[in-house]
UniProtKB/Swiss-Prot annotation:
GO molecular function: oligosaccharide reducing-end xylanase activity
Protein family: Belongs to the glycosyl hydrolase 8 (cellulase D) family.
Stated consequence of mutating residue 263 to C/N: Has high levels of glycosynthase activity. Reduced hydrolase activity
Keyword Zinc part of the UniProt annotation: no
Domain of life of the source: Bacteria
Effect in UniProt of substituting residue 70 to A: Activity is 0.01% of wild type
Summary of pH dependence: Optimum pH is 6.2-7.3. Stable between pH 5.0 and 9.8 for 30 minutes at 30 degrees Celsius.
Organism field: Halalkalibacterium halodurans (strain ATCC BAA-125 / DSM 18197 / FERM 7344 / JCM 9153 / C-125) (Bacillus halodurans)
Protein name: Reducing end xylose-releasing exo-oligoxylanase
Length: 388
């Protein structure tokens, strides 16, 4: 895939799209700080982070009243980007204490849903959590250094987790989270289909540098496989991706998840961050232009579930603020596109969500705020900061 822009991995420079589109540095930094405070502070209307005792904390899915590996891994990524080791360690400690599975077919993975008291709702994992845990742990190691005691030996924990993701089931029970032949991430380990929003090639590029040596080629190949997969999973005219898709990219609608809905929103954000970190391509710019064009004539209060060809359902979006955030974050891949600024402005003028469905929206909101302000960074090992 021919790159049309350089990425921050090579330049060590991060675009601040807010600034490029006319916002002042002071108001941008204030907004980032305020967004963090709304999610991790004391405002009961907007907060999603809760502390337990002296050394534990969790992010609550406020709509489902559970704690998910999605949110916990997101929280760790947010904390390392914001330089909050205290909160990172609380979340990781809660995760290891309550979610990590040491026996059974999924030993080495994390239970995807728990109650706030730590009781497991499920003994199965969801791979989008594991991939975010792994990179957040590497970044923590590189930013703060590894701790001497488990589970705060961050880089060792990350490598161990990625080893399990690739090799689970070799010579015993269990399943890998990636199909080892086509290098594509699965929706859950025991099935052979995918979720386009799980594909994070920009993460796998970094895993190919920092994972166990024997798996580095696998991760490099996974990055390329995911970039190619997104081309066939996103609709050629609308740019919309389904929540579940088969390995050939076609929607998997066996259980009603073959349409553009909540999970799908993350695809635009992921493409944007991949372009920011590793450089954009003609395809990534066009893909974001298509998504932004599709929503250009739609009001957020009328966002719906859509077939990927754009046909709307009656059902309204559950997370319109999240969709505004991800479409804006996509602008990192299409900075000069006809809708890039309008999407960033719409996001800037949209407040953090309140109410019981706020968790997912506000996670996507903070990621977009970080990315669009140049604050969603790759944290390199000491000594590699200047290497190209």
């Amino acid at each position: 895939m021919k790159k049309t822009t350089e990425g921050a991995f090579y330049t060590r420079e991060y675009r601040n799209l807010f600034k490029e589109f006319g916002y002042s540095e002071a108001e941008i930094q204030e907004r980032v700080k305020d967004t963090w405070e709304q999610l991790f502070g004391d405002n009961p209307e907007t907060k999603i982070y809760y502390e337990v005792g002296d050394d534990l904390g969790y992010l609550l899915d406020t709509g489902n009243l559970d704690v998910r590996t999605e949110g916990m891994s997101y929280g760790m990524m947010m904390a390392v980007q914001m330089d909050r080791k205290d909160i990172f360690d609380r979340i990781w400690n809660w995760t290891m204490k309550n979610m990590y599975m040491t026996e059974g077919v999924h030993a080495g993975y994390f239970a995807w849903s728990c109650q706030p008291d730590g009781t497991k709702n499920s003994w199965g994992p969801a791979p989008d959590g594991e991939e975010y845990f792994a990179l957040a742990l590497f970044f923590a190691s590189h930013r703060w250094g590894d701790g001497d005691e488990q589970p705060f030996n961050y880089s060792e924990q990350a490598r161990k987790l990625l080893h399990t993701c690739v090799h689970n089931g070799e010579g015993g029970p269990g399943h890998p989270m990636w199909n080892r032949d086509n290098k594509l991430i699965k929706f859950i380990p025991e099935v052979e289909f995918s979720d386009p929003s799980y594909h994070l090639p920009h993460f796998y590029e970094l895993f190919s540098l920092w994972a166990n040596e024997e798996d580095r080629v696998f991760w490099k190949e996974a990055a390329e496989a995911s970039r190619e997969y997104l081309k066939i999973a996103c609709h050629p005219e609308t740019g919309l991706a389904p929540e579940y898709a088969y390995y050939d990219g076609t929607p998997n609608d066996e259980k009603g998840y073959g349409h553009f809905f909540s999970d799908s929103y993350r695809v635009a954000a992921n493409i944007g961050l991949d372009a920011e970190w590793f450089g954009g391509s003609e395809w990534s710019a066009e893909e974001i232009n298509k998504i932004q064009a599709f929503f250009a004539d739609k009001e957020p209060e009328d966002y719906r579930r859509y077939k990927i060809d754009g046909e709307p359902f009656e059902e309204k979006s559950l997370h319109p603020v999240g969709l505004i955030a991800t479409n804006a974050m996509g602008s990192l891949a299409s900075v000069d596109g006809p809708y890039a600024k309008a999407n960033v402005d719409l996001f800037w003028n949209t407040p953090v969500r309140t109410g019981n469905r706020r968790y997912y929206d506000n996670c996507l909101y903070l990621f977009a705020m970080l990315a669009l302000s140049g604050n969603f960074k790759i944290w390199f090992p000491e000594g590699q900061e200047e290497e190209h």
